[in-house]
Amino acid sequence: MRLFIALPVLIVVVAMALEGPAPAQAAPDLSSTLERLPDKLKEFGSTLEDKAREAIDHIKQKEILTKTRTWFSETFSKVKEKLKTTFA
């Protein structure tokens, strides 16, 4: 799962770093770009993490999903008990 998320993040960051400055900006040298890269990565990672957490919380709070999760849990418990009594 981490690799699944890490590869696209790495590709985006490398693309951002290689894109270079806008024409109106002075061209920074390579060392200053590389110095800012960890800060940009940290900012991008925290933003991505916040958005992912918000999406997961939103999904958890939806009523239909909560009802579905409850129904699956109850059904699984019933099947488990039935199998336990049948094969015990």
Swiss-Prot record:
Q: Which UniProt keywords apply?
A: Lipid transport, Secreted, Signal, Transport, VLDL
User: Which GO biological-process labels does this protein carry?
Assistant: lipid transport; lipoprotein metabolic process; negative regulation of cholesterol transport; negative regulation of lipid catabolic process; negative regulation of very-low-density lipoprotein particle clearance; triglyceride metabolic process; very-low-density lipoprotein particle clearance
Subcellular location field: Secreted
User: What Gene Ontology molecular function terms does this protein carry?
Assistant: fatty acid binding; phospholipase inhibitor activity
In this UniProt entry, which cysteines form S-S bonds?
none
Major place of residence: secreted
Q: Extract one GO cellular component term from the record.
A: very-low-density lipoprotein particle
Report the leader peptide range. Answer: 1-26
A Pfam family assignment: ApoC-I
Report the PANTHER family cross-referenced here: APOLIPOPROTEIN C-I
Q: What does this protein do?
A: Inhibitor of lipoprotein binding to the low density lipoprotein (LDL) receptor, LDL receptor-related protein, and very low density lipoprotein (VLDL) receptor. Associates with high density lipoproteins (HDL) and the triacylglycerol-rich lipoproteins in the plasma and makes up about 10% of the protein of the VLDL and 2% of that of HDL. Appears to interfere directly with fatty acid uptake and is also the major plasma inhibitor of cholesteryl ester transfer protein (CETP).
What is the similarity comment for this entry?
Answer: Belongs to the apolipoprotein C1 family.
Could you tell me what this protein is called?
Apolipoprotein C-I
UniProt source species: Grammomys surdaster (African woodland thicket rat)
Recite the lineage of the species: Eukaryota, Metazoa, Chordata, Craniata, Vertebrata
